[in-house]
Amino acid sequence: MATLFTVTTTSRPFPANPSKTFSPSISLKPNALSFSLTHHRPPRPLRFSKIRSSLPSESDSEPEGGYSITDEWGEQPAEPESPPDNAPSAVSDEWGEKSESVPEESVTRFAESDPPTNEDEWEEREADDGVDKTWELKRCLADTVYGTELGFRAGSEVRAEVLEIVNQLEALNPTQAPVENPELLDGNWVLLYTAFSELLPLLAAGSTPLLKVKSISQSIDTKSLSIDNSTTLSSPFADFSFSATASFEVRTPSRIEVSFKEGTLKPPEIKSSVDLPESVGVFGQEINLSFLKQSLNPLQDVAANISRAISGQPPLKLPFPGNRGSSWLLTTYLDKDLRISRGDGGLFVLAREGSSLLEL
């Protein structure tokens, strides 16, 4: 082990007697030698910047670039850049990290879109949407009942679909008082579909191979308070028409009481040529009628003579017995093209004669 010696000098105050000389004392004090593996960086000398006096003087003037401040290592720290005026303020979170705050969007009571040009613009748009929806429902109803032979051949699914569309149209009824709107109620209405049980025998007869229901229509006249129901049957030889005349009384703005008076059987209209189909289906079998059609061609002249003879005959009128001709009719939907009515448990869907619904 090495031993270090340190020299300590002790100074004493000068004696009052100058004749005595100064004698320093030397003491040797051993210290233990220690080794350290840690490298110590020699300290750098501290530099102190010039301290300005609080009282300015003429000779001590501030330099042109201002005073610079150095740290303990003699390096000049970079001055922090001042944030721009429009920069978002930083927010410190719980971890001490700074995040830029998101600028809030400007809140305004006015919508970005232009305001309506007039107060009724939104009402007009809603009205247009209602008209488009109603027209689509009417077209869908006409397409659904097409090919059902006025409802006689409609299955349960088709009947349920028709009833659903009818309910939607009744909810959009634009005419709440049909009887009080003769300009819409009056006229000739063509039957598109019915679920009236009393018409089923007639529709069944019209589904035979040589007899078809050509049309069923209803004419209403609010001035005379009368209704005329007409039916036309078509065969290869002639067309047969009969009608039922009734009077009605207004019970409510949408309901009338109907009383049938008499039925009328018009003379048949003999066709100038026999209009036979090429074949007919009977009990699931197809029967060819070409030979029968050729055999009846010589009888066309005879049929024309019969037609001219009976064309001038008056129609045959038959009265309705008792109260069997009484009924009621409730109109649940009415516009310029379509009318929906209910009566005695039956449903009637009719289109105005000449309407585009008949062309679908």
UniProtKB/Swiss-Prot annotation:
Q: Where is the composition biased (Low complexity)?
A: 53-68
Q: Which PANTHER family match?
A: PLASTID-LIPID-ASSOCIATED PROTEIN 4, CHLOROPLASTIC-RELATED (PTHR31906)
Sorted alphabetically, the keyword list is:
Chloroplast, Plastid, Transit peptide
Major location (coarse): plastid
Q: Where is this region: Disordered?
A: 1-130
Where is the sequence biased in composition, kind Acidic residues? 117-127
Subcellular localization, as worded in the UniProt entry: Plastid, Chloroplast
User: What does UniProt list as this organism's lineage?
Assistant: Eukaryota, Viridiplantae, Streptophyta, Embryophyta, Tracheophyta
* Pfam families reported for this sequence: PAP_fibrillin
Organelle targeting peptide span = 1-52
The stated induction of this gene product is:
Down-regulated by drought and oxidative stresses. Up-regulated by wounding.
> What family, per the record?
Belongs to the PAP/fibrillin family.
Stretches of Basic residues bias are at 38-50
| Transit peptide keyword on record | yes
Q: Which organism is it from?
A: Brassica campestris
Query: What name does the UniProt record give this protein?
Result: Plastid lipid-associated protein 3, chloroplastic
Feature: compositional bias, Polar residues: 1-37
Superkingdom is Eukaryota
User: May I ask which residue range the UniProt record assigns to the signal sequence?
Assistant: none
